[in-house]
């Protein structure tokens, strides 16, 4: 009888059921010989590439051969040598949330009631009075898409211009009563996440308002943490919530929510005091696509390997000696490096 000694993070409440903790190691299996052809590899470490600002890195994006990074309230550009230059300042509210998106011409940052246009050399406040505030932004077919906080309404910028708005360019996600808490564009479709449901919209080309709801594309699962939404492996991942509870991790299988968390991780998430502050990013390395889900309040980081189908094997945790959780808040691939 072969005893499987290698696996993922699947610790249960009862160690008699499962006691396995896979920490800073990820599993790689041979599909031809899954029982004998498995190995655990160490998660690569981190080295300093650039030193900017005094606060945590809140967001990063690659744009026009530079990285634009937000450190506390400072905006920096970073070049391929790691040299960082402060190019401006933004105003953060109490949540200190920042979201970035970009078109060919510029990056836009939103912080709640404020928005900023960022180039490689300047930061300019958006002054158009029709900007209605947002913590969320993404790019679709020339438009930036935003969601009005604490509402079901979303709106778009002028085409190819994140500083210009029309008060009539808005719509409402109304298939359910939940407010929009997250949004992401995937395969040229706009996914609007509520706390209990998801609506999917697309560019219909209509002249009055270009976006329209996709018929029948409503998911009865919402989002528990807006910053847990991340694209990877040709799909979307997020920490879920619906009318019956919360704390399951999902990936989209076309328009179907597929649970990818295992019972051990779901139990641990359920014991956390505030999962709404969870953050996530995704990256690909050595043939593995990793979804990195962190809970800053509880100092925990869980990582899902999309190359493994079995949730009992696909997860591991990452820990840092000084912090408990993984140190990374966000990620961008630039200059041939994972930053």
Model region roles, listed by residue range:
Residues 72-80, 114-124, 156-158, 240, ...:
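Short, surface-exposed terminal/edge motifs of secreted or surface/virion proteins that either
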Residues 99-131, 136-138, 145-146:
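Hydrophobic or amphipathic alpha-helical targeting/insertion segments
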Residues 2-9, 13, 101, 105-106, ...:
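Beta-sheet-dominated scaffold domains
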